[in-house]
Amino acid sequence: MGKELRAENLAEQFGADTSITKRGVAVLCRAAAAAEPPALANWKTFFPDADGYDLFALHTYYAMLVRLLVERCCGIGADDSFGNGLFGDDLFSWYASVRREPLQRLNNQLAAKMAEYDPPLPGHPGGDLLQQLYHDLVPRPLRHELGEYYTPDWLTQHVLDQIAYTSDTNVRLLDPACGSGTFLVAAIRRILATARLDAAEQQPGNEAPAPETSTELCRKIFASVVGFDLNPLAVMAAKANYLIALRGLLPKSATVEIPVYLRDSILAADRPYADGPDEPFDCVVGNPPWIAWDNLPTEYRRASLPLWQRYGLFSLSGTQGRHGGSKKDLAMLMIYTAADRYLRDGGRLAMVVTQTLFQNKGAGDGFRRFRLGPEGQWLGVLRVDDMVALRPFHDTANRTATLLLEKGTPTQYPVPYVKWSPGDGAPRQLAYEAEPIEPSNPGSPWFLRPAGLKTTRERLVGRSDYTAHLGANSGGANGVYWVEALERSRGGILIRNLAGRGKRAVEEVCRVVEPELLYPLLRWGDVSRYRATPSAHILLVQDVVTRTGIDETLLRRRYAQTHAYFEQFGVLLRGRAAYRRYQDEKPFYSMYNVGTYTVAPIKVVWRRMDRRINAAVVEPVEDPLLGTRPAIPQETCVLIECGSSDEAHYACAVLNSSVVNFLVAAHSISGGKGFGTPSMLDYIRLQRFDPADRRHLELAACSRQAHRLTAEGVATAIVQQLIDRLVGELWGLEESELRTL
């Protein structure tokens, strides 16, 4: 008895850290460098950014294993399978024509290792034997750059279940980004399982279909289970997995064309992929590449831009795009293109996607219209499964969800939305309902609320009476603007810049500057719930009224030492990308997000990109070197200017309440860049402070108590319960509704 042929065993035997793989890739690398095979130039058209021979050698090594695996599992030799065009034009067989003894020895060694495994019997459940090996061999940064993630079998099965895919070969299925064929193999397994049950019913004790039945079954599978991919290595692996799934059913003498095609499903959508007419599919499934627009190659962005525009996926103004709204994902375009070009009317699409598509404000607006262009067909979303808490992809923190939609019908809101979370044994599933947070704007972020909650969206959501702002932004030069105030010195304050901060390394210097432009700095880590304590200082050389840098003539005359300090960093400051793009005619030390609100004496401050709202009241700081000064939050914090201490504490209490935290989490991405941004107040009905309202005064008193308890290291749970009850009253919530939230 040999070893069991399983995906994890192959990855363990031939993984990146094994000695045979390290030696094998080195042998292939040397051979490729010496021979410069024509296949190398062709391969570089698919991987233009690859330098040297390492990746080409690694791909060739993987391809060698694929060939040997097919031979071992199916009994088909290289001459048979590849001679019959099973893998089409093969970029990775170049080593066969390079007569080098080390290459032959490597092939023999790999064949001997593969021979240690027993081929799986026909009818064995099997699966994608190659995906895990690929993910072990190819470096994770490269896989993630290409948007490639390992799809676990249970998630594959879930996607097929969503489209109610069973085993009907009259139902045509496509994976337009099939990778190594995970979804294709899973579909084939379902078809074969039913065929074997039928065979057993017709002839008890025999699960194998008759030869003529097997041939016809394979023909039907070839016609109904199809894959595309633009990576030639993925196409090769998918064809191998496809063939292995059909082992024992195909006559060895058959000439076959596995229906997995080398094809860019997006850019080549209008071109035929096989002989004869391209019939639309009943189902489209898969795990499309997750690649941000900014990370796409420049040429691909240019080539695909008309499609983004055709489908209305670019919905932002230039200003909105500059501030992060252009962080679109290629999966958006894949879904729309696949639905448009490959899916029949009334057909269903189910795909693994990033959950941010449903709540990312700006970047996802066009996608959430669920229409193929301004006058195109509708895409009706039937269900979303949110698996963020499960983290199906263990080697990445991507926010995972699955999407099910039907072509040709508008989306009916609310959409069933299921949140999965780890449980004892099987994961827990909690039912929610999703709808646009702005009913008049179908592209607005989805608002999620527990199914069955009596409170309507209209009662919960409303615009704030307050305006929030980002903190002061140095434009990537924190190491210049952020300083440590050391001591009083003749003519000013001796400072030392925090050289290790910011996107660019700067020289550490000590210098005397005028105290008037120096303020206590609140960094992200300085702010927590009911506590905000500055840990450094910031030089604020911005005119808060004009919102540009202080006039340079004025700065040089009135604050000569501060001007001299910034002048020594002039090259760096003038080289900031944001400065060159937006303020190159302004003083070179100009900052961003600075206005009168920045220096307001009393503020409420919270951190964005957090997992919940953690707000604190910030009042003037008694600085030992500067005297009384307002604290300045950095740009990763958000602030509200307040006119009094009571007003600030009232607002702080409301923002820290469970009601507000529910509302923020219900329409934005916890921990994401869009969480807790100023725009959250577009949907949080934070009323203007009213000193005549008993509840407002009680909330202010509760916030003061919570600040005091936090400073003393005492828990605030009891006072927080009172805050939640009072805020619930402001929203008109019943006790049961408040508990649900």
Where are these regions (language model features)?
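Polybasic, glycine- and aromatic-enriched phosphate-binding surface used to engage nucleic acids
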Residues: 332, 438-698
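Short, hydrophobic/amphipathic alpha-helical patches that form generic packing surfaces
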Residues: 56-75, 135, 240-247, 520-524, ...
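Signature of N6-adenine DNA methyltransferases within the class I
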Residues: 154-155, 185, 192, 235-236, ...
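Active-site-adjacent bridging/hinge elements
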Residues: 34-47, 126-141, 161, 206-218, ...
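Structural motif
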Residues: 47-65, 121-125, 325-327, 508-515, ...
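Class I S-adenosyl-L-methionine
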Residues: 71-72, 76-162, 521, 534, ...
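Charged, often flexible domain-edge or linker segments that flank or initiate folded functional domains
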Residues: 1-100, 145-279, 335, 354, ...
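Non-catalytic DNA-recognition/assembly elements of restriction-modification systems
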Residues: 681, 685-741
